[in-house]
Every structure is written in C-alpha cells, then in structure tokens.
C-alpha cells in the first residue's frame, strides 16, 4: 500500500475529522461521542456532521487551551467507498453480528476501470483495519469498445448512442446482444450490424413461433 493523501479541498463529502490550533497542535476526533465530550459548543449526538454545521464546532487545545477549529478539507470519496464493508453496518459501534456474518464478501463485481479505484481502496483499508481482504473473489466486467476494438471517443466519432439503438432495434435486442456477444470479463467489440442479426435470427424467430401458434390457437379456440 502506497502513501495515500486522503484529503480533498472540496465542499461536499465526508468532513476530515482533524481539528487544528494556532499553536500547531492537531487533534483527530474518533467518534461522535468524543466530539460531543470535547466540543466547546453545547451539542448532542444528533449533530449534523456534514459541512457547514460541523465547521461551527470547536474544541479546546490540550496544549495551550486555545480554541481549535476543524480543517476545511473533506475525505477522498474513494476512502468512503473503500470503507463500505464497515460503514454500512456502523461497525464496530453496532451490528457486529451482521458484519461478522457478511465479512468478507464472497465476491465483488465492477468494471475493469475500478482496479485502481474501488478494488484497491477496499483491500487497502480492510488490510490496514482487519488484516485481511474484504472479498474472496473479484468478478470484472471489461470495457465496451467499437467494432474494431478501439476505445469509443467523441473525438474519433465512434461512439454509439444507446437511446438511438433502443428506438431502432428495441431495448431487449440490445440487452440480449450484450449478454451473448462476449464473456463479461473480456472486452466487448460493439457492432451495430450484429444487432440486426439478433433482431432477425433470435427475436424474429421467437415472434414467428408465437405468430404461428396464435394463428392456429385462435382458429381452434385454444386457451393456453
């Protein structure tokens, strides 16, 4: 695991739980109860912890007794995502049985682009906190490329408008094509002409079978 600068100079996000003093001392608050205990302002555990509300909470500096103020930064959203196994259960403060039953996960599934994102942040945080991986298996779905195997890009002019495909061929044709054209873990070379084949050979066959059945079913008054 490499060094990770988890702070972000943004407004929205999980506030970085660090208070600083003009004397240079820093304090990291580890829980709501600790913040309630140390807060100069009268607050309780129902306090809203997001900005701007948390920025109005100050604590006394244990070094010089001056007022400490929270830094304005928030935490990298990937840290939030990587904390999912613990955060969703508010572990270790509660739901320990639920956590123990579900951790580690049997598998996680995401796109190949999450290798340095969610896959990494999950395993980095879990290994640090729990000493083991948060998942047993990783299922990866690869990227959708153009028919020549090149990345789709507006500058190349090889992008495909899904809504145009829906209108022309139908959503079910597009769904079925993406399911069968290649394994989910390999790149998909998207070929618009192949949609026509799916529409005629697969859905067209189903439609013809139904039409054949309904023709004679109606003639013989069959009620399936």
Language-model-detected regions and their locations in the chain:
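Structured secondary-structure scaffolds
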Residues: 1-219
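Flexible, P/S/T/G-rich "lid" or insertion loops adjacent to the active sites of thioester-utilizing
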Residues: 221-224
């Amino acid at each position: 695991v490499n060094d990770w600068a988890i702070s972000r100079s943004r407004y929205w996000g999980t506030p970085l739980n660090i208070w600083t003093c003009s004397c240079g001392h820093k304090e990291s608050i580890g829980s709501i109860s600790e913040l309630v205990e140390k807060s100069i302002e009268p607050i309780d555990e129902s306090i809203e912890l997001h900005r701007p509300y948390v920025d109005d909470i100050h604590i006394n500096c244990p070094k010089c007794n001056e007022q400490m103020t929270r830094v304005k930064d928030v935490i990298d959203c990937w840290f939030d995502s990587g904390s999912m196994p613990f955060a969703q259960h508010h572990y270790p403060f509660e739901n320990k049985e639920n956590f123990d039953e579900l951790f580690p996960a049997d598998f996680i599934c995401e796109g190949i682009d999450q290798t340095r994102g969610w896959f990494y942040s999950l395993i980095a945080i879990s290994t640090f906190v729990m000493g083991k991986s948060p998942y047993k298996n990783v299922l990866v779905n690869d990227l959708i490329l153009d028919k020549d195997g090149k990345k789709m890009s507006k500058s190349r002019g090889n992008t495909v408008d899904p809504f145009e495909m829906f209108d022309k061929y139908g959503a079910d044709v597009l769904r079925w094509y993406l399911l069968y054209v290649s394994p989910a873990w390999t790149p998909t070379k998207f070929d618009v002409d192949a949609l026509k084949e799916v529409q005629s050979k697969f859905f067209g066959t189903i439609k013809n079978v139904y039409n054949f059945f309904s023709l004679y079913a109606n003639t013989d008054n069959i009620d399936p």
